[in-house]
Amino acid sequence: NNLISFTMKRIVLFLILLTKAASANLISFTFKRFNETNLILQRDATVSSGKLRITKAAENGVPTAGSLGRAFYSTPIQIWDNTTGTVAAWATSFTFNLQAPNAASPADGLAFALVPVGSQPKDKGGFLGLFDSKNYASSNQTVAVEFDTFYNGGWDPTERHIGIDVNSIKSIKTTSWDFANGENAEVLITYDSSTNLLVASLVHPSQKTSFIVSERVDLTSVLPEWVSVGFSATTGLSKGYVETNEVLSWSFASKISINKEDEENKLLISNLEGKAINNLA
Protein backbone atom coordinates (compact mmCIF):
# COMPACT_ATOMS: atom_id res chain seq x y z
CA ASN A 1 0.00 0.00 0.00
CA ASN A 2 1.58 3.28 -1.14
CA LEU A 3 0.09 5.33 1.68
CA ILE A 4 1.24 2.99 4.46
CA SER A 5 4.77 2.99 3.00
CA PHE A 6 4.67 6.78 2.75
CA THR A 7 3.41 7.08 6.32
CA MET A 8 6.23 4.90 7.62
CA LYS A 9 8.80 7.08 5.83
CA ARG A 10 7.24 10.18 7.36
CA ILE A 11 7.39 8.56 10.81
CA VAL A 12 11.12 7.91 10.30
CA LEU A 13 11.64 11.57 9.37
CA PHE A 14 9.63 12.59 12.42
CA LEU A 15 11.84 10.48 14.67
CA ILE A 16 14.96 12.02 13.12
CA LEU A 17 13.54 15.43 13.96
CA LEU A 18 12.97 14.36 17.55
CA THR A 19 16.60 13.21 17.93
CA LYS A 20 17.74 16.80 17.37
CA ALA A 21 16.14 18.00 20.60
CA ALA A 22 19.46 19.45 21.77
CA SER A 23 19.13 22.12 19.09
CA ALA A 24 18.25 25.46 20.67
CA ASN A 25 15.53 26.18 18.12
CA LEU A 26 13.68 22.89 18.53
CA ILE A 27 10.94 22.05 21.02
CA SER A 28 9.78 18.46 21.43
CA PHE A 29 7.88 16.33 23.91
CA THR A 30 6.51 12.82 24.16
CA PHE A 31 3.75 11.27 26.25
CA LYS A 32 4.01 7.47 26.11
CA ARG A 33 1.48 7.47 28.93
CA PHE A 34 -0.37 10.47 30.27
CA ASN A 35 -0.47 12.11 33.67
CA GLU A 36 -1.69 15.58 34.50
CA THR A 37 1.82 17.03 34.46
CA ASN A 38 2.44 19.49 31.61
CA LEU A 39 -1.19 19.43 30.48
CA ILE A 40 -3.94 22.04 30.54
CA LEU A 41 -7.22 20.15 30.95
CA GLN A 42 -10.46 21.95 30.11
CA ARG A 43 -14.10 21.00 30.82
CA ASP A 44 -14.55 17.21 30.79
CA ALA A 45 -10.98 16.20 29.89
CA THR A 46 -9.29 13.92 32.45
CA VAL A 47 -6.35 11.55 32.72
CA SER A 48 -7.08 7.99 33.81
CA SER A 49 -4.94 4.84 33.70
CA GLY A 50 -2.39 6.59 31.52
CA LYS A 51 -4.97 7.61 28.93
CA LEU A 52 -6.08 11.12 28.03
CA ARG A 53 -9.88 10.95 28.14
CA ILE A 54 -11.12 14.03 26.34
CA THR A 55 -14.86 13.50 26.87
CA LYS A 56 -16.85 12.14 29.80
CA ALA A 57 -18.14 8.62 30.36
CA ALA A 58 -20.19 7.11 33.18
CA GLU A 59 -18.66 4.65 35.66
CA ASN A 60 -19.88 1.79 33.47
CA GLY A 61 -17.97 3.25 30.52
CA VAL A 62 -20.98 4.53 28.59
CA PRO A 63 -20.21 7.91 26.99
CA THR A 64 -22.09 10.96 28.24
CA ALA A 65 -24.17 13.02 25.80
CA GLY A 66 -23.27 16.67 25.36
CA SER A 67 -19.74 16.25 26.65
CA LEU A 68 -16.93 18.62 25.65
CA GLY A 69 -13.29 18.39 26.64
CA ARG A 70 -9.99 19.88 25.57
CA ALA A 71 -6.37 19.18 26.55
CA PHE A 72 -3.30 21.20 25.57
CA TYR A 73 0.40 21.05 26.25
CA SER A 74 1.09 23.53 29.02
CA THR A 75 4.01 25.33 27.33
CA PRO A 76 3.20 27.67 24.42
CA ILE A 77 4.78 26.81 21.05
CA GLN A 78 6.26 29.44 18.73
CA ILE A 79 4.88 28.81 15.23
CA TRP A 80 6.43 31.82 13.52
CA ASP A 81 8.68 34.77 14.27
CA ASN A 82 7.44 38.22 13.33
CA THR A 83 10.94 39.71 13.58
CA THR A 84 12.69 37.34 11.17
CA GLY A 85 9.69 36.14 9.19
CA THR A 86 10.69 32.51 9.74
CA VAL A 87 8.04 29.83 10.23
CA ALA A 88 8.36 26.60 12.21
CA ALA A 89 8.30 23.21 10.57
CA TRP A 90 6.48 20.85 12.89
CA ALA A 91 5.19 17.33 13.21
CA THR A 92 3.00 15.44 15.62
CA SER A 93 2.22 11.77 16.03
CA PHE A 94 -0.49 10.31 18.24
CA THR A 95 -2.67 7.26 18.74
CA PHE A 96 -6.35 7.64 19.56
CA ASN A 97 -9.32 5.38 20.09
CA LEU A 98 -12.97 6.30 19.58
CA GLN A 99 -15.67 3.85 20.64
CA ALA A 100 -19.43 4.20 20.29
CA PRO A 101 -21.98 1.93 22.04
CA ASN A 102 -23.74 1.83 18.68
CA ALA A 103 -21.15 1.57 15.92
CA ALA A 104 -23.67 2.99 13.44
CA SER A 105 -24.09 6.28 15.29
CA PRO A 106 -20.89 7.70 16.79
CA ALA A 107 -20.68 11.45 17.44
CA ASP A 108 -19.16 13.90 17.18
CA GLY A 109 -15.41 13.54 16.82
CA LEU A 110 -11.93 14.53 17.90
CA ALA A 111 -9.48 17.13 16.57
CA PHE A 112 -5.84 18.05 16.90
CA ALA A 113 -5.66 21.83 17.10
CA LEU A 114 -3.41 24.86 17.25
CA VAL A 115 -5.18 27.65 19.15
CA PRO A 116 -4.28 31.01 20.72
CA VAL A 117 -2.64 30.76 24.13
CA GLY A 118 -5.36 31.00 26.77
CA SER A 119 -8.11 29.89 24.37
CA GLN A 120 -11.30 28.68 26.04
CA PRO A 121 -13.74 25.96 24.90
CA LYS A 122 -16.27 26.90 22.25
CA ASP A 123 -19.53 25.17 21.28
CA LYS A 124 -20.47 21.53 21.89
CA GLY A 125 -21.61 18.88 19.42
CA GLY A 126 -20.63 19.35 15.81
CA PHE A 127 -18.44 22.36 16.58
CA LEU A 128 -15.98 20.02 18.36
CA GLY A 129 -15.30 22.56 21.11
CA LEU A 130 -13.16 24.65 18.75
CA PHE A 131 -15.62 26.94 16.97
CA ASP A 132 -19.05 28.41 17.60
CA SER A 133 -22.19 28.91 15.57
CA LYS A 134 -21.81 32.68 15.37
CA ASN A 135 -18.18 33.12 14.37
CA TYR A 136 -16.58 31.95 11.14
CA ALA A 137 -14.07 34.82 11.12
CA SER A 138 -10.32 35.12 11.16
CA SER A 139 -10.55 36.17 14.81
CA ASN A 140 -10.73 32.45 15.70
CA GLN A 141 -7.00 32.10 14.91
CA THR A 142 -7.38 28.32 14.91
CA VAL A 143 -6.06 25.55 12.68
CA ALA A 144 -7.19 21.97 13.27
CA VAL A 145 -7.26 18.50 11.78
CA GLU A 146 -10.63 16.95 12.62
CA PHE A 147 -11.61 13.30 12.75
CA ASP A 148 -15.33 13.78 12.29
CA THR A 149 -17.69 10.89 12.99
CA PHE A 150 -21.06 12.60 12.51
CA TYR A 151 -22.69 14.37 9.57
CA ASN A 152 -23.73 17.92 10.40
CA GLY A 153 -25.70 19.15 7.41
CA GLY A 154 -24.74 22.78 7.69
CA TRP A 155 -21.07 22.28 6.88
CA ASP A 156 -20.02 18.62 6.65
CA PRO A 157 -19.63 16.29 3.68
CA THR A 158 -22.11 13.42 3.92
CA GLU A 159 -19.55 10.81 4.99
CA ARG A 160 -17.34 10.45 8.05
CA HIS A 161 -14.17 12.28 7.23
CA ILE A 162 -10.81 13.75 8.11
CA GLY A 163 -10.75 17.49 7.52
CA ILE A 164 -8.40 20.45 7.67
CA ASP A 165 -10.07 23.39 9.44
CA VAL A 166 -8.87 26.99 9.14
CA ASN A 167 -10.79 29.47 11.32
CA SER A 168 -14.03 27.56 10.68
CA ILE A 169 -15.72 24.24 11.38
CA LYS A 170 -16.32 24.01 7.63
CA SER A 171 -13.18 22.22 6.46
CA ILE A 172 -11.17 23.64 3.57
CA LYS A 173 -10.18 20.09 2.53
CA THR A 174 -11.56 16.67 3.47
CA THR A 175 -11.13 13.01 2.70
CA SER A 176 -13.57 10.23 3.54
CA TRP A 177 -12.66 8.05 6.52
CA ASP A 178 -13.80 4.50 7.23
CA PHE A 179 -14.27 4.88 10.99
CA ALA A 180 -13.22 1.69 12.81
CA ASN A 181 -15.22 1.57 16.03
CA GLY A 182 -13.09 0.81 19.07
CA GLU A 183 -9.93 0.26 17.01
CA ASN A 184 -6.76 2.27 17.51
CA ALA A 185 -5.94 4.93 14.94
CA GLU A 186 -2.35 6.05 14.41
CA VAL A 187 -1.99 9.60 13.11
CA LEU A 188 0.91 11.61 11.76
CA ILE A 189 0.53 15.30 10.90
CA THR A 190 3.38 17.31 9.38
CA TYR A 191 3.75 20.93 8.37
CA ASP A 192 6.46 21.89 5.87
CA SER A 193 7.12 25.60 6.32
CA SER A 194 9.00 25.85 3.01
CA THR A 195 5.87 24.94 1.05
CA ASN A 196 3.10 25.66 3.61
CA LEU A 197 1.94 22.07 3.08
CA LEU A 198 -0.06 20.53 5.92
CA VAL A 199 -0.40 16.74 5.57
CA ALA A 200 -2.40 14.44 7.85
CA SER A 201 -2.38 10.66 7.54
CA LEU A 202 -4.27 8.05 9.57
CA VAL A 203 -3.75 4.30 9.71
CA HIS A 204 -5.96 1.69 11.39
CA PRO A 205 -3.39 -1.11 11.91
CA SER A 206 -6.02 -3.73 12.76
CA GLN A 207 -7.97 -2.98 9.59
CA LYS A 208 -4.95 -2.32 7.36
CA THR A 209 -6.68 0.83 6.12
CA SER A 210 -5.13 4.24 5.64
CA PHE A 211 -6.25 7.75 4.73
CA ILE A 212 -4.55 11.03 3.83
CA VAL A 213 -5.53 14.67 3.39
CA SER A 214 -3.35 17.67 2.58
CA GLU A 215 -3.64 21.38 1.83
CA ARG A 216 -1.43 24.45 1.75
CA VAL A 217 -2.02 26.73 4.73
CA ASP A 218 -0.11 29.95 5.41
CA LEU A 219 0.04 29.80 9.19
CA THR A 220 1.36 33.37 9.47
CA SER A 221 -1.94 34.67 8.11
CA VAL A 222 -4.03 32.53 10.47
CA LEU A 223 -2.26 31.95 13.78
CA PRO A 224 -0.63 34.22 16.35
CA GLU A 225 3.12 33.77 16.78
CA TRP A 226 2.63 31.64 19.89
CA VAL A 227 -0.01 28.92 20.18
CA SER A 228 -1.16 26.06 22.36
CA VAL A 229 -1.24 22.61 20.77
CA GLY A 230 -3.47 19.74 21.77
CA PHE A 231 -6.83 18.06 21.41
CA SER A 232 -10.52 18.88 21.53
CA ALA A 233 -13.44 16.47 21.31
CA THR A 234 -17.20 16.32 21.78
CA THR A 235 -20.00 13.79 21.99
CA GLY A 236 -23.43 14.14 20.40
CA LEU A 237 -26.16 16.06 22.15
CA SER A 238 -28.44 13.02 22.54
CA LYS A 239 -27.55 9.69 24.17
CA GLY A 240 -28.06 7.72 20.96
CA TYR A 241 -25.16 9.56 19.33
CA VAL A 242 -22.13 9.34 21.57
CA GLU A 243 -18.59 7.94 21.68
CA THR A 244 -15.57 7.81 23.94
CA ASN A 245 -12.65 9.97 22.79
CA GLU A 246 -9.30 8.79 24.15
CA VAL A 247 -5.73 9.67 23.21
CA LEU A 248 -3.29 6.90 24.15
CA SER A 249 0.08 8.48 23.30
CA TRP A 250 1.37 11.71 21.78
CA SER A 251 4.62 13.18 20.43
CA PHE A 252 5.23 16.64 19.03
CA ALA A 253 8.25 18.49 17.64
CA SER A 254 8.68 21.92 16.07
CA LYS A 255 11.70 23.77 14.76
CA ILE A 256 12.28 27.17 13.17
CA SER A 257 14.97 26.90 10.47
CA ILE A 258 18.16 28.84 11.04
CA ASN A 259 20.71 27.09 8.83
CA LYS A 260 21.24 25.29 5.52
CA GLU A 261 20.92 21.82 7.04
CA ASP A 262 17.44 22.65 8.30
CA GLU A 263 16.42 23.86 4.84
CA GLU A 264 17.73 20.62 3.28
CA ASN A 265 15.71 18.56 5.77
CA LYS A 266 12.55 20.52 4.92
CA LEU A 267 13.20 20.04 1.19
CA LEU A 268 13.52 16.28 1.73
CA ILE A 269 10.16 16.15 3.52
CA SER A 270 8.59 18.32 0.81
CA ASN A 271 9.84 16.09 -2.02
CA LEU A 272 8.71 12.91 -0.26
CA GLU A 273 5.22 14.23 0.43
CA GLY A 274 4.84 15.59 -3.08
CA LYS A 275 5.76 12.26 -4.67
CA ALA A 276 3.44 10.31 -2.40
CA ILE A 277 0.48 12.60 -3.06
CA ASN A 278 1.08 12.32 -6.81
CA ASN A 279 1.23 8.52 -6.55
CA LEU A 280 -2.08 8.44 -4.68
CA ALA A 281 -3.87 10.87 -6.98
UniProtKB/Swiss-Prot annotation:
InterPro entries in the cross-refs: ConA-like_dom_sf, L-lectin, Lectin_LegA_CS, Lectin_legB_Mn/Ca_BS, Legume_lectin_dom, Leguminous_Lectin
Superkingdom assignment: Eukaryota
Recorded effect of pH on activity: Optimum pH is 7.4. No activity between pH 4.0 and pH 6.0, 80% activity at pH 8.0 and 20% activity at pH 9.0.
Subunit structure, interactors included: Tetramer of 2 alpha and 2 beta chains.
Described function: D-galactose-binding lectin.
PANTHER family with a match to the protein in the record: CONCANAVALIN A-LIKE LECTIN FAMILY PROTEIN, LECTIN
Protein name: Lectin alpha chain
Organism of this sequence: Lablab purpureus (Hyacinth bean)
High-level lineage: Eukaryota, Viridiplantae, Streptophyta, Embryophyta, Tracheophyta
